[in-house]
């Protein structure tokens, strides 16, 4: 077993011991205007836009933005060092004291909550966390719009997106602290990898430090990038990540739009592996999507074999949990309330509330039993399914056919005339049986396989048997129940 942790070097709790030692690593706002603290609206732009440089003139022309900036103050130790030292002394001498309460009393300040770096995002502030100051000056690109004013550090769409908007003065002490978090866990707990939350918004130089420090201890230490856009996979790979999370949670459930097909087939072209998963802790549950448990089962099995994919199962997915942990991504307006009203966890979100997964539901064994069988096939032929050169995409009579097909040439058996290929085919119709023809021309050409008798190794709907349903062109004719997956050895 390998153990990975999740680290979030971009943010910190709004109240922590680091404030005592380094108050200037944080952003501070006046308490008398704190009730008005909210991401400012930028007129003339749409909703939820990435903070591209071409939008800066709009941002800094907004009166709401300037009203927001004026809510910020310099750190309390800069305003009055002697008073700050007295506050710290009082904190250490008072059991149970809150540093924020003391700062509020003496300075009228508090730490500024974080919010989304996307312009006009509908999300409210993230009141439990704040951003670290990655640089000790304002971003170079943003300084053009400040008119030479001396302004306190402030949180805004650009200042917190430090992969794009960098300053001239690195916060060296902070960077040293952040880049030594993983080595601490390696040396004390022997961890094997980490996901860097919001790493895409960090300066590339800091990411390189974090990765280099970890791999000094363990050259095989694995890094997962919280990169959702597949087109940025190359950047993540170049930065030293092993894999990305990707956009599967959005694409995979949309079978009728053929987004499932596009994501699964196109994954092989990415420069690094991507999560093969249809749900995360931020998204709707697969079992609560259109297609329900049928969809969840089909995707869970197919993700075990997706080319260039890293199979990912979100906690609770294995028992068809329908209540999301959070409603951060791709959620419907009723997502939080999918449980029956009389369920004790109705409306509860695991990221915020006391919650227990419904492990005792009557279907709790179906996916674990399925995965036990499927995982053995994958494990027994791991080198076959994890090398892209063994993969051959399988098509059907029509692009509109509701089916997905993967072909794999068994490792070390290319050129054999039989017993050397795997055919994995699934129906993406969740409601009706289908009959389709799986075209094997490319698979046969590349593998050398000419055989027309196969073995059904696994099906979600029938027992193992011999397979003889080939047409005159030696293509495979298959009948599939709704959401059925078949794995055939030929």
What are these regions (language model features)?
Residues 1-144, 200-229, 427, 483-485:
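Acidic/aromatic-lined carbohydrate-recognition and catalytic surfaces
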Residues 14, 158-174, 192-201, 244-252, ...:
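The substrate-binding groove and active-site-proximal loops of carbohydrate-active enzymes
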Residues 134, 138-167:
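N-terminal small/glycine-rich loop or linker at the start of catalytic domains
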Residues 144-146, 150-151, 216-301, 305-312, ...:
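Glycan-recognition surfaces
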Residues 157-233:
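Active-site neighborhood of glycoside hydrolase catalytic domains
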Residues 277-280, 285, 289-454, 482:
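Loop/helix patches that line or flank the sugar-binding groove of alpha-linked glycan CAZymes
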Residues 453-473:
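Solvent-exposed beta-strand/loop surfaces of large extracellular or lumenal domains
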Residues 466-490:
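C-terminal beta-strand-rich structural cap/linker in extracellular carbohydrate-active enzymes
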């Amino acid at each position: 077993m390998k153990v990975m942790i999740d680290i979030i070097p971009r943010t910190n709790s709004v109240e922590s011991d680091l404030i005592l030692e380094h108050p200037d690593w944080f952003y501070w706002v006046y308490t008398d205007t704190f009730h008005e603290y909210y991401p400012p609206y930028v007129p003339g732009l749409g909703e939820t836009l990435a903070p591209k440089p071409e939008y800066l003139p709009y941002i800094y022309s907004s009166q709401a933005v300037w009203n927001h900036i004026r809510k910020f103050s310099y750190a309390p130790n800069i305003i009055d060092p002697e008073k700050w030292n007295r506050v710290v002394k009082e904190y250490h001498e008072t059991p149970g004291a809150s540093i924020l309460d003391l700062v509020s009393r003496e300075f009228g300040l508090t730490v500024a909550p974080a919010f989304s770096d996307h312009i006009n995002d509908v999300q409210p502030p993230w009141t439990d966390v704040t951003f670290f100051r990655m640089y000790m000056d304002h971003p170079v690109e943003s300084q053009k719009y400040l008119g030479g004013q001396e302004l306190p550090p402030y949180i805004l769409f650009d200042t917190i997106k430090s992969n794009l908007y960098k300053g001239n003065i690195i916060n060296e002490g902070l960077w040293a602290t952040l880049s030594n978090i993983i080595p601490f866990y390696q040396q004390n707990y022997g961890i094997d990898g980490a996901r860097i939350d919001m790493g895409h918004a960090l300066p590339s130089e800091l990411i390189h430090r974090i990765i280099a420090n970890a791999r000094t201890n363990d050259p095989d230490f694995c890094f997962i990038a919280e990169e959702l856009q597949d087109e940025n996979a190359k950047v993540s790979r170049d930065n030293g990540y092993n894999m990305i999370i990707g956009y599967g949670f959005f694409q995979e459930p949309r079978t009728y739009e053929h987004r499932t097909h596009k994501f699964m087939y196109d994954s092989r072209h990415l420069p690094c592996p991507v999560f093969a998963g249809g749900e995360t802790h931020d998204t709707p549950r697969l079992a609560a999507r259109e297609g329900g448990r049928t969809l969840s089962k089909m995707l869970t099995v197919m993700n075990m074999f997706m080319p260039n994919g890293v199979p990912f199962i979100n906690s609770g997915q294995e028992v068809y949990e329908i209540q999301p942990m959070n409603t951060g991504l791709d959620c419907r307006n009723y997502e939080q309330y999918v449980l029956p009203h009389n369920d004790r966890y109705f409306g509860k979100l695991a990221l915020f509330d006391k919650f227990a997964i419904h492990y005792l539901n009557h279907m709790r064994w179906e996916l674990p039993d399925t995965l036990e069988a499927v995982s053995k096939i994958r494990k027994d032929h791991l080198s076959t399914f994890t090398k892209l050169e063994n993969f051959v995409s399988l098509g059907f009579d029509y692009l509109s056919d509701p089916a997905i097909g993967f072909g794999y040439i068994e490792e070390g058996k290319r050129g054999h005339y039989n017993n050397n290929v795997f055919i994995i085919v699934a129906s993406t119709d969740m409601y009706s049986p289908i009959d389709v023809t799986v075209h094997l021309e490319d698979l046969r050409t590349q593998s050398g396989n000419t055989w027309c008798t196969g073995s059904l190794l696994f099906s979600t709907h029938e027992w193992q048997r011999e397979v003889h349903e080939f047409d005159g062109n030696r293509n495979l004719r298959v009948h599939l129940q709704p959401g059925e997956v078949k794995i055939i050895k030929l």
